[in-house]
Amino acid sequence: MTVDPEELRKMETGDLLKKLDELKLELIKLRVQSRMGTLKNTASIRNTRKDIARILTVLSEKKKVKREKVENK
């Protein structure tokens, strides 16, 4: 379930934050499954971490653009 960065850039900040919360919960569940030995696809932990990083990157890009707009006024 890899998230496309271009798709993320089109999303609103509130939607990105909701998606971030969902992915963090999913990561917690995956880590629990990993510890219990019931996780079948171990790459899903890595993929979820990368998705979280993508969302955080897009959020910081949006903050930077907003900050530049305020400074230029």
Swiss-Prot record:
MF term (GO), any: structural constituent of ribosome
Domain of life according to the entry: Archaea
Any single Pfam family the record assigns to this protein: Ribosomal_L29
Gene Ontology biological process: translation
Native source organism of the sequence: Saccharolobus solfataricus (strain ATCC 35092 / DSM 1617 / JCM 11322 / P2)
InterPro entries: Ribosomal_protein_uL29, Ribosomal_uL29, Ribosomal_uL29_CS, Ribosomal_uL29_sf
Keyword terms, alphabetized: Ribonucleoprotein, Ribosomal protein
One GO cellular component term noted in the UniProt record for this chain: cytosolic large ribosomal subunit
Gene3D superfamilies linked to this entry: 1.10.287.310
Name of this chain's protein: Large ribosomal subunit protein uL29
Family from the record: Belongs to the universal ribosomal protein uL29 family.
